[in-house]
Amino acid sequence: AKEASDWYRVNPHRLHLGIIGLELGNEVRPSDVQNIQQSLDMWNGIINSRFTLKETPYYIQTVCHPERDMIAARLSARQPAGIKFHFPYPTGGHCDDACNWEANDKHSTTLVSEDAQSAVLKRTLDATTYYVTISWEGPAKLSEKSANYFVLTPTDSIFTFTCQFTPQVSASPILTFTEVQQASSGHWKNYWTQGAVADFSQCT
């Protein structure tokens, strides 16, 4: 019975597609991050994040495409931070973060193609292969920090990028942050104005 229920309930190979975040350096401690403000604009589907690090204010907008496995972000900072793309091996567990950082020999991340504004990474682990397409606006350099760890370093104080996960190399046009933002805004506007929402705020 347990085997049958697990067939429905358990992912046989729980897979973390990757960590995307700011490359702030190992010397940064949680206490160094001050004035944290984060809010979700539910009408447009945008997360607005603000914080201060070493007296430098950061403002990040993050949005998800409604139909593709794609996120986009806009970073504003006087001292630009790198964007990290860090890929773990799955743990196979059920109640953890699915990240095994001690198994770099069991999976690989290779740079398939690159130009001045985009790059494609190929992820291979066991029998699974998927692709990570990164595109950006403005000058930036993508470098391999270590195995399964890439950093995109911009030079401008305002920087935007998109990242898409696909089972094959994507043949679709690469979208900009603005295009993803517009797609998200249109999707959520339609959701809130055309969908049905039950209001229980007056219930006692």
Language-model region placement:
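Acidic/polar, glycine-enriched structural segments that form the non-catalytic walls/loops
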Residues: A1-T204
